[in-house]
Amino acid sequence: QDIKRKTINICIMNLLDFYRQYPDEASCEEALRRFREHHGLFCSQCGGLRLSWNPSHKSWTCMDCKHEMQLRSGTVMQGSHLPVRDWFAAMFLLTATKRAISTKEIQRQIGRKRYQPVWEMVHKLRDVMGKRDGGYPLHGDMEVDEGFFSTETPEEQKDCPLKRGRGSQRKTSVLVMAESSLPKTPPAKKYSTPKSVGHIKMQVIDDFKASTITSKIKQGTDGNADVTTDGFSSYVSLEKNGVASSHHTVVTDDKRSVGKVLPWVHIVISNAKRSILDTYHDIK
């Protein structure tokens, strides 16, 4: 079921605010308990709603079946031995700035000696963040194109002859979708992008078959989008297959023209590549 978009008030927190609000492990555990109880808590065993908090065990006890449910049960933190405060700090570091941050830097910031548990924590957080964003379908006017990111050649393909262009072993293919519409008032700056951007989705694809691309677009949109693409053959049947309410194709060899008609997908691809190069030495 698709998650409906909601307008929420976000409290911007800086580093000093974070340490003031969460000075120790006890404050983080209390915040997690209040959050879970506020957003609805039920017994994982019988579904009962009558739960009693046991501070000495840091768990709830179901009044109906007597099942004991730990503070982290059913959350992304379940099974982790890292303190709740480390999880809160990682969430803050991942979302507090526009620039990406590496797991190695998060490890340094929270003062952990071992890399593996920090990597697992960050991987879980990024996974659930992606799933949450994946629940919001794109709609309205939309641009679609593919991006190619330089990555290491997979081990099983290192002895194979290198391909060129689409399908190269040294490139990972990503389908980029961006809500893009003409603003009510024209941009003030002469060289500003002529369209305004909304939400964006990027998904790794294994091949460029029409069925693969159609499936990814169908998963990421509400089915009523007005899609604009280049002349790649895999996009031809989008409207016919009910993936888009209308489909506009731009066929041109002039890169400047494509940049004007499909500006935001190219900006997104460029920014993503720059972010990866600024944050990581290499990616697989």
Give each language-model segment a name.
Residues D2-K284:
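Residue-level recognition of single "structural anchor" positions
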